[in-house]
Amino acid sequence: MSVLEVCFVRHAQSVSNAAGIWQGQGDSPLSEMGRAQVEGLTRTLRDQPYDLAISSDLSRAADTAKSLGINVEQDRAWREIDVGEWEGLTMDEVIERFPEQMVALRERRTFEIGGGESWPEVFARADGALAALRGRLPEGGRAIVFTHGGIIASILAGLVGARDAFPWPLGRMRNTGRTTLRFQDERVELLAHNDDRHLNEELRQPYEPRPDQVLVRLSTVGEASDPGTTDFNSAIKSARNTSAGGVVSVSAASQRIAKLAQDTAGTVPSEFRFLEPPLGHTSELLISDGQPMLLDYALPSIQI
């Protein structure tokens, strides 16, 4: 049986991230906060053994990769989507200048964003890069890839069969968030999603729910026999109806949380599996009128 593990790391905060403007293949450097995030990442990654380390050739990813202190290959295939004329604009400016494109984006219609790349072009590029990486790893091999939010999210959406959804159920990548996948022949296991617990609280980027959203913190308790929050599903429905724009905490056994994570991702192929989170672990789920989104799902580091 072939077993491989790949850890994807979104780059640390860039100057464009801090300014709240679109960045695609423009080469925005790391911000002061981003450099501090790299230090936090270094403490977690520096003693981890990897058979292969790759980064996008854009400086915000390449400079984040320096946290490993080892030789890291640079590969253009791992670049962010090219957003063309959207580059350097705020969201409000994009909505004002390209209203038709924003509608097409929400409806998941194929078009070249800002005259740059289309999402199907990015999917093909990301899938090809991942296939090439897997082909280079030895049996039991581990790789780490420093790349971009759009690339990581598009790979995950492809694996769970949700590329036509808006928003993607496993999206909204945090700076230096780690997403780890284990490949066992045709089966894929999600070991961690968007894990930034290596950062101090002041360097993390908590999601602030909009008035039409509820942020649900899912805490793992006991085994299947432990009921956790009484009537788990009703608690989430009640939160959605009464706590809009707020945060609610619920608890459940690890099996139920893994099932909820899988349900959030939609009709997941049988070969994709969410591993069950450990006792005391907290995950985050965003609920709105649209498709729910899993913001955070992390497990202890698992060696293979």
PLM-predicted stretches and their roles:
Residues 1-4, 84-92, 139-141, 158-234, ...:
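Acidic, low-complexity terminal tails and accessory targeting/binding regions
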Residues 6, 141-150, 214, 245-252:
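Generic beta-sheet signal
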Residues 15-18, 224-226:
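Short N-terminal binding/cap micro-motifs at the start of the first secondary-structure element
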Residues 21-29, 89-91:
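Short glycine-enriched, charge-decorated loop/helix-capping segments at active-site entrances
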Residues 39-102, 209-282:
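Phosphate-coordination/substrate-recognition cap region in phosphate-metabolizing enzymes
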Residues 101-121:
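Short glycine/proline- and acidic residue-enriched helix-loop micro-motifs
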Residues 122, 127-136, 140-149:
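GST-like fold's C-terminal all-alpha helical module
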